[in-house]
Amino acid sequence: MHPLLVKSFAKINLGLLITAKRQDGYHTLETIFAPINWYDTIEFSDSEKISMSCSNSDLPVDDNNLCIKAARSLQQFAAVRKGIAMKLQKQVPFGAGLGGGSSDAATVLRVLNELWKVNASPAELHALAVKLGADVPYFLSMKGLAYATGIGDELDDLALTLPYYIVTVFPEEHIATVWAYKNFYSRFDRELPDLKKLLSELCLSGKKEGLPAFENDFEPAVFDHFPAVRKVKLTLLEAGSIFSSLSGSGSAVFGLFEREDEALAAMKLLPEAYRKNLTPPGFCMAQ
């Protein structure tokens, strides 16, 4: 086969409400996943064994890497002995709350299901994806906005598009998801907003009154421990963002802007060392 190059897009969380802690230690949540035009690329080539290389030397390329785990899980599921060589060009920051590793794993499952002619059903691929990580099912089966519950693996595809420019900023702080879950300030007894209804009003009618309800429960603890991350949010709001929030467990922060010129101006106000991305209105991963 000729080498195959595939994009793996990242996401932000528009609201992330942690609703309970299960007996197995996992937390349930409600969130809206929104895709952004920030992506890694993976090149797939023929090989007798499963292997990978990565442009970022800080990431492992052994069995601890999610791409390798995804390939091996499909190999075991299908009882095939085929291999693959993967070259990961890492652009999405890791430890940022943008789901870069989960997206890469989903890409591997989807591509190898075709290349190896496994023909696993969507339900079978979903089951493999959940074992790799809570965000992996979103990247496997969704292209645009999605409402997620459970541990993030129960998904409702929303026939909506976000009519705003999204500025996403990585302030060069890596925050482990395990740390975030250990340190967030729990509020399990509150009344929860209807995120789907509020999002529909925002996307279809432009009603912004519900935006404050899209809280991220990791944000208070992250901001207390990482003041540079808090400063990014304040800068985006001062620059005209109609809403700004931490994404996932951080440290990436995003802002919604009504005008492209405001979004571009906001990006220039942030330190040059911070990695930044601009996503246009209505973006979906099928583009």
Swiss-Prot record:
Catalysed reaction, written as an equation: 4-CDP-2-C-methyl-D-erythritol + ATP = 4-CDP-2-C-methyl-D-erythritol 2-phosphate + ADP + H(+)
Pathway(s) where this gene product acts: Isoprenoid biosynthesis; isopentenyl diphosphate biosynthesis via DXP pathway; isopentenyl diphosphate from 1-deoxy-D-xylulose 5-phosphate: step 3/6
An example Gene Ontology molecular-function term: ATP binding
Residues where ATP binds: 93-103
Keywords for this protein: ATP-binding, Isoprene biosynthesis, Kinase, Nucleotide-binding, Transferase
BP terms from Gene Ontology: isopentenyl diphosphate biosynthetic process, methylerythritol 4-phosphate pathway; terpenoid biosynthetic process
Superkingdom per UniProt: Bacteria
EC number: 2.7.1.148
Keyword Nucleotide-binding part of the UniProt annotation: yes
Active site per the UniProt annotation: 11, 135
InterPro entries tied to this protein: GHMP_kinase_C_dom, GHMP_kinase_C_sf, GHMP_kinase_N_dom, IspE, Ribosomal_Su5_D2-typ_SF, Ribsml_uS5_D2-typ_fold_subgr
Family statement: Belongs to the GHMP kinase family. IspE subfamily.
Function: Catalyzes the phosphorylation of the position 2 hydroxy group of 4-diphosphocytidyl-2C-methyl-D-erythritol.
NCBIfam families: ispE
PANTHER family: 4-DIPHOSPHOCYTIDYL-2-C-METHYL-D-ERYTHRITOL KINASE, CHLOROPLASTIC
Protein name listed in UniProt: 4-diphosphocytidyl-2-C-methyl-D-erythritol kinase
Organism: Pelodictyon phaeoclathratiforme (strain DSM 5477 / BU-1)
